[in-house]
């Protein structure tokens, strides 16, 4: 019995030390799984192309011109003082033949460039924060949603991480009905996000 409790104490100590470490690592970004079975062959998977970055992983859809989903880990070690990038970026790392959404594609649409993996979750370095400003991490969001309940949930998840928890998050758009903004970026009928603590 004494050995059992000692082992549990060591595991608890190890886990509490690990959760404070940054989770900027491609291998850690898909602990919630690959919900659409996205794969890395760009020819066979134009609507479900898997991209794994150090900051987040996602299944990209070249038809809707946005992610099907984005997954990332969040701990207190992922939040620093680099601040928010002042710019959005065209994602030139998408496969050849995929449309690269421009920051100006959302101009005049009435929709925000809504982050899936949010800026505030990747502020240890400026480079980490810049990556979440790739347009391939955006979906059109109504300003009331993006700046309201969506932003509040992002803040809540960071609060959970700040108190020592590891938060596994996956989010995405859904309910497409054929409406688009400039350059054919699809407008989702709803947005969704799941956080596992």
Predicted features along the sequence, with ranges:
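Bacterial N-terminal signal peptides that target proteins for export
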Residues: 1-8
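Domain-level detector for secreted/extracellular nuclease and nuclease-toxin modules, and
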Residues: 4, 14-197
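Short N-terminal leader segment in a subset of presequences, especially plant chloroplast
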Residues: 9-13
């Amino acid at each position: 019995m004494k050995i059992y409790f000692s082992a549990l104490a060591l595991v608890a100590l190890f886990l509490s030390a690990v959760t404070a470490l940054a989770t900027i690592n491609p291998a850690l970004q898909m602990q919630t799984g690959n919900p659409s079975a996205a794969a890395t062959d760009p020819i066979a998977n134009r609507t479900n192309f898997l991209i794994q970055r150090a900051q987040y992983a996602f299944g990209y859809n070249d038809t809707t011109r946005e992610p099907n989903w984005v997954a990332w880990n969040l701990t207190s070690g992922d939040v620093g003082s680099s601040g928010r990038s002042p710019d959005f970026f065209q994602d030139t790392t998408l496969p050849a033949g995929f449309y690269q959404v421009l920051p100006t594609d959302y101009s005049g649409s009435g929709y925000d460039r809504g982050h899936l993996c949010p800026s505030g979750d990747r502020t240890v370095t400026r480079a980490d924060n810049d990556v979440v400003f790739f347009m391939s991490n955006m979906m059109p969001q109504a300003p009331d949603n993006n700046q309201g309940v969506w932003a509040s949930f992002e803040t809540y998840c960071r609060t959970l991480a700040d108190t020592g928890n590891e938060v596994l998050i996956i989010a995405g758009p859904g309910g497409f009905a054929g409406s688009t903004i400039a350059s054919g970026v699809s407008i989702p009928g709803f947005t969704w996000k799941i956080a596992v603590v």
